[in-house]
């Protein structure tokens, strides 16, 4: 996981058809480059809970630990500059904002992950206006689940919706607060916390990540 940030983008929401917006720089893509002037503020605080190196083998260790350790949490603050922080399998990062995110027209904030076009790093996204009650964006993947995608395969952007990491590297994946249901415990005009939760890329039902209509992300990340 690399960066999360806030921006103001006056655009229509994504249409939810059979497939979703394509890769960055393709016609119809919703990806926003890290240098876009649409970004107006960045996360200012972070708490990370590291996940397993390999959730299917919790006894696997490196350097005496079965949890990931690459990068420091502070690498995820401010504008993307290259350094990252690893979350590991089902790891989480909760970011805070001195300037709350509000529900404007179109997309309201974006999340950066450090995957590449051939290796997407995917995550669920949740938001909170009080730091206690979190609400998850409904995510959907149309990725096939018959065969486990191998180490050099990856889900494809047109089959992914509301998953951080849909776009690789220098491009943020945008989110629209209007897609969340109304709730008395969520003030969409005062979002102070955004939580990123690693998606385990496995079709084994013991470890697979499921959410919304169907989220079955088929890439095993060791």
Across the structure, where does each feature detected by a protein language model lie?
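A domain-level signal for the mature, folded cores of soluble proteins
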Residues: 18-123, 133-222
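Sec-dependent N-terminal signal peptides
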Residues: 4-13
């Amino acid at each position: 996981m690399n960066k999360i940030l806030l921006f103001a983008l006056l655009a229509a929401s994504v249409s939810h058809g059979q497939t979703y917006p394509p890769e960055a720089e393709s016609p119809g893509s919703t990806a926003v480059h890290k240098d876009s002037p649409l970004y107006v503020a960045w996360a200012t605080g972070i708490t990370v809970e590291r996940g397993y190196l390999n959730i299917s083998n919790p006894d696997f260790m490196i350097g005496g630990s079965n949890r990931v350790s690459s990068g420091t949490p502070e690498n995820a603050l401010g504008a993307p500059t290259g350094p990252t922080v690893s979350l590991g399998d089902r790891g989480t990062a909760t970011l805070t904002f001195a300037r709350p995110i509000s529900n404007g027209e179109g997309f309201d904030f974006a999340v950066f992950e450090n995957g590449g076009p051939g290796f997407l790093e995917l995550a669920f996204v949740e938001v909170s206006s009080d730091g206690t009650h979190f609400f998850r964006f409904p995510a959907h993947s149309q990725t096939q689940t018959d065969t486990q995608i191998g180490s050099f395969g990856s889900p494809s952007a047109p089959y992914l919706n509301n998953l951080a990491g849909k776009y690789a590297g220098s491009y943020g994946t945008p989110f629209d607060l209007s897609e969340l249901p109304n709730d008395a415990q969520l003030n969409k005009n005062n979002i102070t916390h955004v939580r990123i939760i690693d998606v385990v890329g496995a079709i084994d039902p013991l470890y697979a990540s499921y959410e919304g209509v169907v989220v079955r992300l088929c890439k095993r990340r060791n």
